[in-house]
A protein has these predicted regions:
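A short, conserved beta-to-alpha structural element at the edge of catalytic cores
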Residues: 8, 47-62, 220-236
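Active-site-proximal N-terminal segment of extracellular/periplasmic enzymes that hydrolyze or transfer
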Residues: 2-49
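Metal-dependent active-site segment of extracytoplasmic phospho-/sulfohydrolases and closely related
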Residues: 20-23, 176-211, 370
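A short acidic (Asp/Glu
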Residues: 31-35, 161-166, 203-209, 382-383
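Short, solvent-exposed loop/turn segments at secondary-structure junctions
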Residues: 26-29, 72, 155-159, 200-202, ...
């Protein structure tokens, strides 16, 4: 039986088929669509775009998709807004997977995940982790009770893309296809298989953004702890995984100037910060804009106010909404209209996604400023950068990283699914 708060309960095998739910970490929609064109996953329904929330990171995405508790921070090294200091780090990956190391309640729902040390080793020896994961998953699934759903999470795919690139992932999907054919033959039509991913990936040459160096040149002090002094130039920015965004924490009065200073740095696309109860500012080299949100009678709408230029490249979408009569007198259009118009945009579902990144609890300790990096750039730990050579990464709000996938053996899915609308299709 599955249940989630007020959501309806269903009994696997009685009101719907038993479900094998399999999450593949970091697999982009485009690679799965290409795999289908090569003849893999024959007999499945077409994959749909699953829009991952910004920053496009595993725990943020899965907590949204499964309506679970939010993680403390964007990564295991995070800034604690209560103590005003950076906490956490590599200790999460040492020892056993104890309750204090679980980032979100979605992990309580997993029937299979790799042993804790493999969460780090997957970025050192991804092929070995993938093969071991496949063997353990196959054995544990075959031994699981056949009258309930089974939820597995395979992280090897993320490591393969990060460290090896697209071709090893294509081969991994071939081996997965063979295994799933075996499972389908064994389980029959009584078991639905639903494949999905948490986020996509930007594949290609990845260069470091020299964020801390630039901020120091601009007169800021990089700190682990903020003392709260008015006018202080301290900036805390945790550096952990090699990813396509950065989370900055600073004094309230410095946000606008900080975002302005970052427009000059190579690799920075734009920054976002809250500037009102119902609006955020987007500021980048292409200009600045504000995203306004309005809720009336349970209906949510957004307005894109171009202050200077068009940092989100939404002029065409805005004109289309206007031509179709979907903008009201104040320039607002419904959230559904914006989503439908921008689901495949360079910044998928940009208005809701970016606004909610700062105004909903995607993490407990929300940043003062979120920096979106251009495709091909990363920020993170210098130590990790010396250990691995990146072939791909994720984290930003651009299409490649934001577009995950969902695909079912039994159901035709909508053309696109937002992360916060995914749970009924996955678990309920």
């Amino acid at each position: 039986m599955t249940t989630n708060g007020n959501h309806k309960q269903e009994r696997a095998g009685l009101t719907r088929p038993r479900r094998l739910l399999l999450c593949l970490d970091g697999v982009p929609f485009d690679i799965v669509r290409e795999a289908r064109e090569r003849g893999l996953f024959e007999g499945w329904n077409e994959p749909t775009r699953l829009l991952s929330p910004f920053p496009t990171m595993t725990n943020i995405a899965l907590s949204a998709m499964l309506r679970a508790t939010a993680p403390l921070g964007y990564e295991s090294l995070y800034f604690d807004r209560n103590s005003r200091e950076i906490r956490g780090g590599i200790g999460k990956y040492i020892g056993r997977r104890t309750p204090d190391k679980l980032p979100s309640s979605y992990m309580d729902e997993l029937d299979y995940q790799e042993p804790l040390p493999f969460e780090f080793l997957v970025y050192v020896a991804p092929e070995a982790v993938w093969r071991a994961d496949m063997r353990r998953f196959r054995e544990q699934f075959r031994n699981a009770p056949q009258r309930r759903d089974y939820f597995a999470f395979l992280k090897g795919t993320d490591g393969l893309l990060h460290i090896r690139g697209a071709e090893p992932l294509r081969r991994a999907l071939e081996s997965l296809d063979r295994l799933l054919k075996e499972i389908r033959a064994w389980c029959g039509a009584e078991t639905e298989i639903t494949l999905f991913s948490d986020h996509g990936m930007t594949i290609g040459e990845i260069r470091r953004v020299h964020l801390q160096t630039h901020l120091r040149r601009c007169g800021y002090e990089i700190v682990d702890r903020l003392n709260g002094r008015a006018g202080g130039r301290g900036v805390a920015l945790p550096a952990f995984g090699l990813i396509g965004y950065a989370a900055l924490f600073c004094n309230e009065e410095n946000k606008g100037k900080l975002a302005e200073d970052l427009t000059e740095l190579e690799g920075v696309d734009f920054s976002i910060y809250r500037d009102a109860a119902d609006a955020i500012t987007v500021k980048g080299a292409e200009g600045s804009a504000r995203i306004h949100r309005r809720e009336e009678d349970g209906r949510i709408s957004y307005r894109y106010e171009q202050v200077a230029g068009d940092p989100l490249r939404l002029t065409e979408a805005l004109c289309g909404l206007s031509d179709e009569g979907l903008l009201d007198d104040e320039g607002y259009a419904s959230a559904k209209s914006w989503s439908a118009r921008t689901a495949t945009h360079i910044y998928p579902d940009a208005l809701a996604n970016l606004y909610n990144a700062l105004n909903t609890e995607r993490v407990h300790h929300t940043a003062d400023l979120l920096v979106n990096l251009k495709d091909g750039y990363y920020y993170g730990s210098s130590l990790f950068a010396h250990i691995v050579s990146l072939k791909a990464t994720h984290g930003n709000a651009l299409r490649a990283s934001s577009t995950a996938f969902m695909m079912s053996t039994h159901r035709a899915l909508p053309e696109f699914v937002r992360a916060d609308e995914a749970r009924p299709l996955l678990k309920d």
